[in-house]
UniProtKB/Swiss-Prot annotation:
SUPFAM superfamilies: Ribosome-binding factor A, RbfA (SSF89919). This is Ribosome-binding factor A. One of its GO terms (molecular function) is ribosomal small subunit binding. InterPro entries: KH_dom-like_a/b (IPR015946), RbfA (IPR000238), RbfA_dom_sf (IPR023799). Its main location: cytoplasm. The keyword Cytoplasm applies. Pfam families: RBFA (PF02033). Coiled coil: none annotated. HAMAP family: RbfA (MF_00003). Belongs to the RbfA family. Monomer. Binds 30S ribosomal subunits, but not 50S ribosomal subunits or 70S ribosomes.
Length: 123
């Protein structure tokens, strides 16, 4: 239980540090001036790697281009974030897009279908 609590705390600290670096230090043209939200960080049990899940608002560049830029900047982001966190080993960062809007769209479409069926059965 204590290990689980510690892992959650480290994940939250990593999330905050990475978000700060992306916001203030990264100058990549496909990253800066984009709405990038770090939805969650999942640290491996051995603390050597972390999966960083991001949500990228649609823009001129596709999500894939922004994700590729994040992956290319992962070393820099880790180096800058390690200045704020005191960890024995700073994990390797692996970025993944997490589409947080997809489940909402699915639920909304289901509700619309139910409303249409309701109109047909109860005019």
């Amino acid at each position: 239980m204590a290990e689980n609590r510690r892992m959650k705390k480290v994940n939250a600290m990593l999330r905050e540090a990475i978000a700060k670096v992306i916001l203030k230090d990264v100058k990549h043209p496909k990253i800066s001036n984009r709405w990038i939200t770090i939805t969650r960080v999942s640290l491996s049990r051995d603390l050597q790697s972390a999966c960083v899940y991001v949500s990228i608002m649609p823009h001129e560049n596709s999500q894939e281009e922004t994700l590729a830029a994040l992956k290319a900047s992962a070393g820099f982001i880790a180096f800058q974030a390690s200045k704020d966190l005191v960890l024995k080993y700073f994990p390797d960062l692996n970025f993944y897009v997490e589409d947080i809007f997809s489940p909402q769209d699915h639920i909304e479409s289901l509700l619309l279908k139910i409303a249409e069926q309701d109109k047909k059965t109860n005019p």
